[in-house]
């Protein structure tokens, strides 16, 4: 720190040079991050990191930069205070002066990183740098003249300080005087193609070496991390985390009941799988293979994945990043982690990070975290420095795809980390070609241990990587299929509207007809789930199953309305146990035999979690508390979108699934008869018609293409299903979870269909940053509005106020919804983001369907 307390000024108010302050801290942290790694040309990354860290801000020594940093006015053009490019020239000089060979590639990457170290949208693009500094144009000529003036200013006012930085960066091999001579030679003649101009023009050459992108991302994200953590004041001993105690997980698993009969056999297989997976980790961490955990739904993947991940992280003395596809699953898994390990999501042991979460680490009284934005606590958590980080596939892979400045700080945490990717089949098919490239980056460049875990392995590495192989962590996956064959849990019933899919027949089922089938399936106290492809389709089916007109007296109970009635009366959300009690009381009063629930992305996250817990979670309450709704004497009908499709631990007697690719069908089937209880469950695959006020069939909206032609996923699904359906129109689960999945992916990747966006993968290989910048795994999220729906008294008091702040917003993550809102109470700006504020007790929010 300088005497005036600002660690980025380089020179304090009293003229004291900040020799051991910001630059030294950044250099030390970059060296630590890069230590032990080489760039793709063999250059030691730590050496380059040290030079970059020491020189990245050296042009702040100009009089104009110093005046700007202190809020003083100066007479020159504002561009005279810019320091990125002149600092990059010093970096290039220093790399050329070190006393051992550094290749042109390493020098180019270092120069590029410093020239773009204040970029916020993405790493610097070599083509952009070439255009800005390698073209013989008046504007570029003016830039070099201005830069030369900046160096003259440093020479006149801070030559000793500049010399000290360069000497440190080059281990005494370079000097400020040497740099000045070097620069002056390289800009002669200033009005012609001088050496600097030629050098930066060549950087735009598209013929780049393999792993150019890897090297660029490594150094740029390392600089972003080191620079931001140093500027925030984070101390070295706060740049780490602690793994949760694995013994707590072992104790939790040991305490689980053994069960009886077929459940006892299932629990034996679950523990056997977990034991095998943990044993397989010992070998996995010594290789560059990608681990696979392939288990049917309900066979204990979550415990197996956590056990394997924690063991591997302990072996590697690193951290665990556990990745899931949906925020709804994250919240459920986070609750389980907190319960098992007795940890807070705001601790150095555990971080929950997704776009709706409140993400920060409590670091004690050492820092101020009152305004959780990019405070030290938020920076620690968003940089994934805790021992265990639970996050989404979107956060992981978008952070590796031309990361923004905010995303960049988490990339160094992946070095030697263990990354468990749960439900990888949920990765959008448009990313199927780039994701293998990014996993190669993790394994080959960052020495990460990657595990893919699902019931429906998509073959991303098998079909998408030329450098990696896979290693199954369970010894005999066939035994789990055999168990399903001898103990049938569900049967898949292919509806007549789907039979013609292989031939392109798009026959559909009306919502009225579908509603009657759902109602029939729910008779005699049966629980029914129907999974739809779109939010509009789910609403249409719900209305067909249970009319929602306010004036109609129907002997049924709707959980969404029960929640809202309770909030109207008390101002607070009920607990899951209270919600059960209220639902049972209302059912008794009305003489109802069915309880209805609805879940989609339009429903507030807090309400979704509340409904899911009320349905299934038997760990809540005490001995006198009512059973979960799915275990009660009432029928439950849940109409939902894919928010329940993977990882949500609910079980129904019958599941209806709108037509979708085979992995989605299998995941929905995993919500049926999970514990092998009673009669064999039934999973019906049908094709729903377009909902009211729409002319688009939902399955084609999500999985189809223009003009009504099915995309490869649906065509291949139809072909595979047609090859396995029996004379009664059914497929056994043991076949569905294995043969059909394998054939589906083989047909996609080995046939002519070629799924995925090749342009994204090619952009990684060619380091085309401009093509990667802003790439979104789920474009729908980016196009939706950010909505804050205040329902409880506390939420409404905070979010409906004119003084809404980042802190208030963070305190109500469970009230935030991403959707295309038709109405809002008002619009507010927080930072650079726009939010629509909705009073959830107004007509803008439906008690059942959520944001309208």
Task: List PLM regions with ranges.
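Post-DEXD/H (motif II) to motif III coupling segment of the RecA-like Helicase ATP-binding lobe
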Residues: 407-485
